[in-house]
């Protein structure tokens, strides 16, 4: 899943501006993208001021209320905000996309087989498309 910059719909901010100007950037505390952007900011001396939030929707709220200039989050909550009619837009991606998976001990071969079969059945069912549309805006 890509990580995106989100601004107000009428903002002129660009991804380059985010990395080169002294703006307020909102991130969700404790996420992999928060860890990555903090590390990158320190290494590359990005001038933005980070503001941390308990959730991506809270960052969107502060963005809309003018407390931050941009939010940085996974694409899913950004797409959800846009789908709900919030006055925000994605202005670009940054960083490495995040992949998700299920971890299983090597010795749990039977559990792995059950999980993989479950995924195959779910993705073959038309209900999978409904879930993607409902939760992933696809």
Language-model segments: which ranges?
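Proline/Glycine/Serine-rich low-complexity intrinsically disordered segments
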Residues: 1-138
């Amino acid at each position: 899943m890509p990580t995106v910059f989100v601004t107000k719909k009428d903002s002129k901010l660009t991804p380059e501006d985010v990395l080169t100007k002294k703006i307020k950037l909102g991130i969700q505390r404790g996420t992999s993208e928060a860890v990555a952007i903090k590390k990158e900011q320190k290494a590359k001396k990005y001038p933005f001021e980070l503001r941390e939030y308990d959730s991506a929707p809270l960052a969107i709220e502060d963005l809309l209320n003018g407390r931050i200039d941009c939010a940085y989050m996974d694409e899913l909550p950004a797409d959800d905000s846009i789908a709900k009619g919030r006055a925000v837009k994605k202005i670009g991606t940054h960083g490495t996309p995040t992949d998700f998976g299920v971890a299983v001990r090597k010795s749990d071969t039977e559990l792995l087989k059950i999980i993989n079969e479950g995924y195959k059945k779910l993705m073959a069912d038309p209900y999978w498309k409904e879930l993607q549309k409902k939760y992933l805006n696809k």
